[in-house]
Design a protein with these regions (language model features):
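Transmembrane-helix signature of 12-pass secondary carriers
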Residues: 1-522
Length: 522
């Protein structure tokens, strides 16, 4: 660290972990819990929607009702379109108006649209699905705002020794949300099964689809509003990271504003986002964060959104004609829950505990490589694994989830919150996250089209393409740099050699006064 660094820029860098750090992790993390639940719970009930609204008794193949491919892709993918637009809009707004002012808006949108998604009524299948897609777009819009705002707020609260772990801990709540998406659907479908038993489709095509299932999918979607609703009050109580008056109020300290030095600091660092100086300093990093997140989400969302179609090949669920509608929801949800609990969830927390020891760069590099390796094995040996070794298939498949989360799914969220200057940090994180959601849309609208009919050759080709995609992510990781153990200003070059830093002055200050510095600098 430069010895002439502004005293105010020590902000949170040398501070010990305090209670408000933990509070911020929980509050921001509950947003990601809600995000993950809302985005992934639809996969547990999408086949039920097909049985309820698209069963054709005149179908000569005598198959259960199934959402047509374009409609299935849109039902599952429309929230991702909303997420992409929400990331760009709220990321920009967070830099213009401040993080706190728009942080509550995203939560309100998520609550209202989660409830309205479950109230999607109509006189025809088309009107029900159309209304559902409308509200899920705006649900995704609110979810999108949470990505840049939560990451930016957490990075600006934390000290440099724990910053990566804190941001990763917020993001790790996504894993808990995915688990609960499977768990809630599993519990509710089991209750409905006990109350409304029915024969398998192959035994009775009509009565195998319980009409009460129409309540099940609505309840599953509406429950996504609860965690967001419970944290709204606390989110509004969080201090703004920008104005020092808020942080001073929280920490009960008086702030040394150092106005002259701050004026010099701001003069040096006021170049805009769309400028030659920005691209000279940060252009490669922005390309790196956008490309790696884009490539990662093609694979990650393809896995998560299409796993319901791969579960039969792994022997984790029965084929559709062998079960009734509610039983299919139960088996799909149970399989999602098991994969998330054993594969997805541990990966997030390995990252939290090791990110400050190993570093972001190595975790991301190894994660991409291992994902590519396991998918390559699955793709090459698909027929053998499907027919002769389903447990090995399930293990390899679970390991791809583990290394996605103990790997690029976590680090692509952390790095954009650290690499860029304060005044454009939220916008740059939003651009990176939006690139990721563009990749997720490829997973939802393109890859899912290959897996929907459960054709072995198509699934095999899709997995091999994803293996190649992960290897491209491995290569693009070299465009970013390690941020472990460095302050945000040092990483982004914001200190710029302006001002000076007195060890004795800082050591004589109360801890809270040192912590408040970055808030004033911002």
């Amino acid at each position: 660290m430069s010895t002439n660094k502004l005293a105010v820029l020590n902000a949170l860098d040398t501070a010990r972990t305090q209670w408000y750090h933990v509070t911020a992790i929980v509050i921001a993390g509950m947003g990601f819990f809600t995000d993950a639940y809302d985005l992934f719970c639809i996969s547990t009930v999408s086949k039920l929607l097909g049985r309820l609204y698209y069963y054709d008794p005149a179908n000569p193949k005598h198959n259960p009702g199934k959402l047509p491919t374009p409609i299935n892709n849109f039902v599952i993918g429309v929230a991702l379109v909303g997420t992409l637009t929400g990331q760009l809009f709220f990321g920009w707004l967070g830099d213009k108006l401040g993080r706190k002012k728009v942080y509550g808006i995203t939560l309100i949108l998520m609550v209202i649209c989660a409830i309205c998604s479950g109230l999607s009524f109509g006189s025809s299948a088309r009107s029900v699905i159309g209304t559902l897609c409308f509200f899920r777009f705006w649900l995704g819009f609110g979810i999108g705002g949470d990505y840049p705002l939560s990451a930016t707020i957490m990075s600006e609260y934390a000290n440099k020794k724990t910053r990566g772990a804190f941001i990763a801990a917020v993001f790790a709540m996504q894993g808990v949300g995915i688990i609960f998406a499977g768990l809630v659907s599993m519990i509710l479908s089991k209750i409905f099964l006990q109350l409304f038993p029915a024969p398998a489709f192959e035994d009775d095509e009509i009565f195998s689809t319980q009409p009460e299932g129409d309540y099940l999918w609505r309840i599953v979607l509406m429950l996504g509003a609860l965690p967001a609703l419970t944290t709204y009050y606390w989110r509004m109580k969080m201090p703004e990271t920008g104005p020092a008056s808020d942080m001073g109020r929280v920490l009960d300290i008086e702030i040394d504003e150092e106005h002259d030095k701050l004026s010099q600091f701001k003069e040096v660092n006021k170049y805009p986002l769309l400028s030659r100086e920005f691209f000279q300093r940060h252009g490669l990093h922005l390309i790196g964060t956008m490309s790696t997140w884009f490539l990662l989400d093609i694979a990650f969302y393809s896995q998560n959104l299409t796993q319901k179609d791969i579960f039969p090949a792994m022997g984790l669920v029965h084929k559709a004609p062998q079960v009734n509608a509610l039983r299919e929801v139960f088996e799909t949800s149970r399989a999602m829950f098991v994969v998330a609990l054993l594969g997805t969830f541990p990966g997030y927390w390995f990252t939290v505990f090791l990110i400050e020891k190993i570093g972001r760069f190595i975790i991301q590099l190894v994660g991409f490589f291992m994902m590519s390796l396991f998918m390559l094995i699955i793709g090459i040996k698909y027929d053998y694994l499907k027919n002769d070794n389903k447990w090995l298939f399930a293990t390899l498949y679970g390991l791809t989830f583990f290394f996605a989360n103990f790997g690029p799914n976590s680090t692509t969220f952390v790095l954009p919150a650290e690499l860029f200057p304060t005044r454009v940090r939220s916008t740059c994180h939003a651009l990176s996250a939006a690139a990721g959601k563009a990749g997720a849309m490829i997973g939802a609208f393109v890859v899912q089209s290959y897996t929907l009919d459960e054709d072995s050759k198509k699934i095999q080709h899709a997995v091999l393409v994803l293996a190649f995609t992960n290897m491209l992510g491995f290569c693009c990781t070299f465009l970013v740099t390690e941020t472990k153990g460095r302050s945000l200003e040092e990483i982004s070059g914001e200190d710029g050699g302006v001002g000076y830093y007195h060890d004795t002055e800082m050591s004589s200050r109360p801890t809270g006064a040192r912590q408040s510095g970055r808030m004033e600098a911002i």
